[in-house]
């Protein structure tokens, strides 16, 4: 009886649970998740090199495959690995061919992981070599973006402080006139 009651409460809770509380749903007005800074920097730097999906890799993720997920092609190490089975590789995109000729596919979501790259030439990632030139470019761009964000934050703080100071001066002048 207690198990049945607990199951009913659990089902009712899941049915009533607001969409915004679930990680896989973006509610209206909610800011959607964004890729990691490194992933976004890679996409920006290599936007002209992105290609369409190659049908030769359609079955790359068919059987149970231990798959390495990467922040970007050429990264020093994979973000994590997971077992993928029957995932439609042709839904990956955009794609990228690295300097070693390996074919990469991008996905916004795969089994709880967001914004990752998969090397379709070698899903396990055993033969994937890090590309120091790519790493250097991506890290430099991430640093530039972080510096720009910091500068914007400092500028906003200075502007707010200036508005507060001007408002304080005006209030003090108004008080002196009223006396």
List each language-model region with its residue ranges.
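Short, Lys/Arg-rich N-terminal segment immediately upstream of the first membrane anchor
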Residues: 1, 145-147, 178-179
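SH3/SH3-like beta-barrel superfamily modules
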Residues: 83-123
């Amino acid at each position: 009886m207690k198990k049945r009651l607990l199951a009913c409460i659990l089902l009712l809770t899941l049915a009533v649970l607001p969409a915004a509380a679930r990680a896989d749903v973006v509610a209206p007005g909610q800011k959607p998740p964004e890729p990691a800074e490194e992933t976004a920097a890679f996409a920006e730097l290599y936007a002209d090199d992105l290609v369409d999906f190659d049908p030769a890799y359609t079955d790359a993720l068919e059987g149970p495959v231990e798959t390495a997920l990467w922040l970007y092609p050429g990264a020093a190490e994979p973000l994590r690995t997971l077992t993928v089975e029957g995932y439609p590789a042709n839904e990956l995109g955009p794609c990228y061919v690295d300097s070693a000729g390996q074919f990469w596919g991008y996905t916004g979501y795969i089994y709880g992981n967001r914004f990752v790259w998969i090397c379709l030439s070698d899903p396990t990632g055993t033969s994937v070599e890090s590309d120091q030139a790519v790493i250097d470019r991506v890290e430099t761009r991430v640093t530039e973006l972080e510096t720009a964000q910091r500068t914007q934050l400092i500028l906003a703080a200075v502007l707010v402080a200036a508005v507060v100071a001007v408002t304080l001066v005006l209030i003090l002048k108004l008080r002196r006139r009223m006396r």
